[in-house]
Amino acid sequence: MVRQMLIFDMDGTLTDPVQVINNDVKDILRRCKRKNFEIAVVSGSKYEKIKGQLNDGFIDEFDYVFSENGTQVYVKNVLVKSLDITEAIPETKLRKMVEFCLRYIADLDIPTKRGTFIEHRKSLINICPPGRNCSMVDRRRFVEYDSIHHVRQKLIQVLKSQFDSDDCPLSFVAGGQISIDVYPKAWSKSIALSHIGKCDVIHFFGDNTREGGNDFEIYNHPDVIGHTVTGYKDLVNQLEELLAKS
């Protein structure tokens, strides 16, 4: 039997940003499974956040859950593989980067600052100029402001010039709507592909597929058929087309 897999980004793809999964998405994913597609989700978020968005136990219907870009691998709620950023980047470099970002954000003139500007996850550093504690209203204000003033892209360029190096190559990418993710260059979302074994056909669906976005590498991987989506409704439409051809 041909082994086929569908891999999905979370925010902006399976769900609206930081919202729970819609029943229409659940229904079509179940139809995909009945057509013998395996399904997986890969997100920069922590596992607990992914689990909360895939509510009512729906996470159990995924064959793989790849949190933190695929460096934390879960199969049926069991962690089977984990990478730690502190084992890949020297502590002195991590500390200097965090201190630099806090000073940089302190001097930013942006609509709101709400706290939790730096989040140290197991395998990546999440930098959030408005703060991860921001409300949905705050989030929308920053998204609009960032689309005009390019706050994140400017910070990304500064971080690249300050902290990327040949001896410790790092990726600095736009994550979701309001953040920047920092991780070793080899730990993009495409690392998830190394955990699924031999697969005949792999489709990836994501919204942040442009260069500089955190879906770019897996979307452009030679073993992957990449699909750019504009939201969960567009995802449903694209999956309907895929099922019609299956």
UniProtKB/Swiss-Prot annotation:
Domain of life of the organism encoding this protein: Eukaryota
Pathway where it operates: Nucleotide-sugar biosynthesis; GDP-alpha-D-mannose biosynthesis; alpha-D-mannose 1-phosphate from D-fructose 6-phosphate: step 2/2
Record-linked Gene3D superfamilies: 3.30.1240.20, HAD superfamily/HAD-like (3.40.50.1000)
Residues reported in the UniProt entry to bind Mg(2+): D9, D11, D207
EC category name: isomerase
Subcellular localization: Cytoplasm
Reaction catalysis annotation: alpha-D-mannose 1-phosphate = D-mannose 6-phosphate
GO BP, one annotated term: mannose metabolic process
UniProt: alpha-D-mannose 1-phosphate binding residues: R121, R132, R139, S179, D181
Signal peptide bounds: none
Active site location: D9, D11
Keyword Hydrolase found: no
Primary subcellular site in the record, as a coarse category: cytoplasm
Keyword Flavoprotein set for record: no
Gene Ontology CC annotations of this record: cytosol
One Gene Ontology molecular-function label: metal ion binding
EC number: 5.4.2.8
Keywords assigned: Cytoplasm, Isomerase, Magnesium, Metal-binding
Family recorded in the similarity comment: Belongs to the eukaryotic PMM family.
Function noted in UniProt: Involved in the synthesis of the GDP-mannose and dolichol-phosphate-mannose required for a number of critical mannosyl transfer reactions.
Quaternary structure annotation from Swiss-Prot or TrEMBL: Homodimer.
The protein's name in its UniProt record: Phosphomannomutase
